Amino acid sequence: HLPFPDGAADILLDCFSPLAIDEFRRVLKPGGYFLYVVPGARHLWELKQILYDAPYPNEEKETPYEGFAYTDIVPVDFPLHLERQADIQSLFRMTPYCWKTPKSGVERLETLETLDCQASFRVHIFQKL
Protein backbone atom coordinates (compact mmCIF):
# COMPACT_ATOMS: atom_id res chain seq x y z
CA HIS A 1 0.00 0.00 0.00
CA LEU A 2 1.53 3.28 -1.12
CA PRO A 3 1.26 6.00 1.55
CA PHE A 4 -0.72 8.40 -0.67
CA PRO A 5 -4.41 9.26 -0.92
CA ASP A 6 -6.43 8.15 -3.93
CA GLY A 7 -5.79 10.23 -7.05
CA ALA A 8 -2.95 12.24 -5.48
CA ALA A 9 -0.04 11.60 -7.85
CA ASP A 10 0.75 13.14 -11.23
CA ILE A 11 3.59 10.73 -11.97
CA LEU A 12 5.07 7.53 -10.54
CA LEU A 13 8.38 5.83 -11.29
CA ASP A 14 9.03 2.10 -11.01
CA CYS A 15 12.65 1.19 -11.66
CA PHE A 16 13.62 -2.50 -11.75
CA SER A 17 10.93 -3.40 -9.20
CA PRO A 18 7.80 -5.52 -9.37
CA LEU A 19 4.82 -3.46 -10.51
CA ALA A 20 2.15 -2.53 -8.00
CA ILE A 21 -0.32 -1.82 -10.80
CA ASP A 22 -3.42 -1.74 -8.58
CA GLU A 23 -1.75 0.83 -6.33
CA PHE A 24 -0.66 2.86 -9.35
CA ARG A 25 -4.28 2.88 -10.54
CA ARG A 26 -5.42 4.02 -7.11
CA VAL A 27 -2.96 6.85 -6.44
CA LEU A 28 -2.56 8.33 -9.94
CA LYS A 29 -4.78 11.20 -11.01
CA PRO A 30 -6.72 10.70 -14.25
CA GLY A 31 -4.26 11.60 -17.01
CA GLY A 32 -1.30 10.91 -14.69
CA TYR A 33 1.69 8.89 -15.85
CA PHE A 34 3.74 6.02 -14.62
CA LEU A 35 7.18 5.21 -15.96
CA TYR A 36 8.28 1.60 -15.79
CA VAL A 37 12.04 1.16 -16.24
CA VAL A 38 13.23 -2.31 -17.24
CA PRO A 39 16.51 -3.70 -18.56
CA GLY A 40 16.98 -3.72 -22.33
CA ALA A 41 17.74 -6.94 -24.20
CA ARG A 42 21.50 -6.50 -23.93
CA HIS A 43 21.73 -4.67 -20.59
CA LEU A 44 25.16 -5.41 -19.09
CA TRP A 45 25.70 -7.99 -21.85
CA GLU A 46 29.49 -7.94 -21.56
CA LEU A 47 29.22 -8.63 -17.83
CA LYS A 48 26.84 -11.54 -18.51
CA GLN A 49 29.31 -12.99 -21.04
CA ILE A 50 31.93 -13.16 -18.30
CA LEU A 51 29.59 -14.61 -15.68
CA TYR A 52 27.76 -17.25 -17.72
CA ASP A 53 28.79 -19.86 -20.25
CA ALA A 54 25.60 -19.30 -22.28
CA PRO A 55 24.14 -15.85 -21.53
CA TYR A 56 20.79 -14.92 -23.04
CA PRO A 57 19.29 -11.51 -23.77
CA ASN A 58 16.62 -10.05 -21.51
CA GLU A 59 13.13 -10.37 -22.91
CA GLU A 60 11.71 -7.12 -24.26
CA LYS A 61 7.95 -6.97 -24.50
CA GLU A 62 5.07 -4.55 -24.45
CA THR A 63 2.54 -5.42 -21.76
CA PRO A 64 -0.74 -3.49 -21.69
CA TYR A 65 -2.37 -2.74 -18.33
CA GLU A 66 -6.08 -2.21 -17.89
CA GLY A 67 -6.95 1.43 -17.25
CA PHE A 68 -3.75 2.74 -18.85
CA ALA A 69 -2.77 3.83 -22.34
CA TYR A 70 0.65 2.69 -23.51
CA THR A 71 2.16 5.95 -24.76
CA ASP A 72 5.83 5.26 -25.51
CA ILE A 73 8.97 3.22 -24.95
CA VAL A 74 12.11 5.32 -24.58
CA PRO A 75 15.46 3.56 -25.00
CA VAL A 76 18.26 4.69 -22.71
CA ASP A 77 21.66 3.23 -23.60
CA PHE A 78 25.12 4.28 -22.51
CA PRO A 79 28.59 2.76 -22.07
CA LEU A 80 30.15 1.99 -18.71
CA HIS A 81 33.91 1.91 -18.23
CA LEU A 82 34.99 0.53 -14.88
CA GLU A 83 38.67 0.91 -14.07
CA ARG A 84 38.94 -0.88 -10.73
CA GLN A 85 38.03 -4.32 -9.45
CA ALA A 86 36.15 -2.64 -6.57
CA ASP A 87 33.90 -0.84 -9.08
CA ILE A 88 33.34 -4.06 -11.04
CA GLN A 89 32.32 -5.81 -7.82
CA SER A 90 30.02 -2.93 -6.87
CA LEU A 91 28.24 -3.22 -10.21
CA PHE A 92 28.01 -7.00 -9.88
CA ARG A 93 26.60 -6.81 -6.34
CA MET A 94 23.79 -4.46 -7.39
CA THR A 95 22.48 -6.94 -9.98
CA PRO A 96 20.44 -10.11 -9.51
CA TYR A 97 23.40 -11.97 -11.07
CA CYS A 98 25.11 -11.67 -7.70
CA TRP A 99 22.70 -14.25 -6.27
CA LYS A 100 22.68 -16.80 -9.08
CA THR A 101 26.07 -16.75 -10.80
CA PRO A 102 28.04 -20.00 -10.71
CA LYS A 103 31.31 -19.92 -8.78
CA SER A 104 33.30 -20.19 -12.03
CA GLY A 105 31.71 -16.97 -13.31
CA VAL A 106 32.46 -15.12 -10.08
CA GLU A 107 36.06 -16.29 -10.26
CA ARG A 108 36.39 -15.04 -13.87
CA LEU A 109 34.98 -11.68 -12.82
CA GLU A 110 37.45 -11.42 -9.94
CA THR A 111 40.39 -11.59 -12.38
CA LEU A 112 39.38 -8.43 -14.27
CA GLU A 113 41.10 -5.12 -13.74
CA THR A 114 38.77 -3.19 -16.06
CA LEU A 115 35.36 -3.75 -17.60
CA ASP A 116 33.66 -2.04 -20.51
CA CYS A 117 29.98 -2.80 -20.88
CA GLN A 118 26.75 -1.30 -22.10
CA ALA A 119 23.91 -0.21 -19.83
CA SER A 120 20.61 -0.57 -21.66
CA PHE A 121 17.21 0.40 -20.27
CA ARG A 122 13.71 0.74 -21.67
CA VAL A 123 11.40 3.31 -20.10
CA HIS A 124 7.81 2.25 -20.72
CA ILE A 125 5.44 5.20 -20.36
CA PHE A 126 1.79 4.71 -19.44
CA GLN A 127 -0.99 7.26 -18.96
CA LYS A 128 -3.97 6.63 -16.71
CA LEU A 129 -7.23 6.75 -18.64
Regions found by a protein language model. Give the residues of each.
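S-adenosyl-L-methionine-dependent methyltransferase catalytic core, i.e., the SAM/SAH-binding region
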Residues: 11, 22, 52-57, 68-75, ...
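A short glycine-rich, Lys/Arg-flanked "PGG" loop and its adjoining helix->strand segment in the class I
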Residues: 19-35
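A short acidic, Gly/Pro-enriched loop at the edge of an enzyme's catalytic core
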Residues: 1-12
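Residues lining the SAM
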Residues: 10, 15, 37
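Conserved class I S-adenosyl-L-methionine
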Residues: 33-66
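Conserved Class I S-adenosyl-L-methionine
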Residues: 76-129
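Short, well-ordered alpha-helical microsegments
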Residues: 2, 20-22, 44
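Short, well-ordered secondary-structure micro-motifs
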Residues: 5-7, 25, 47-48
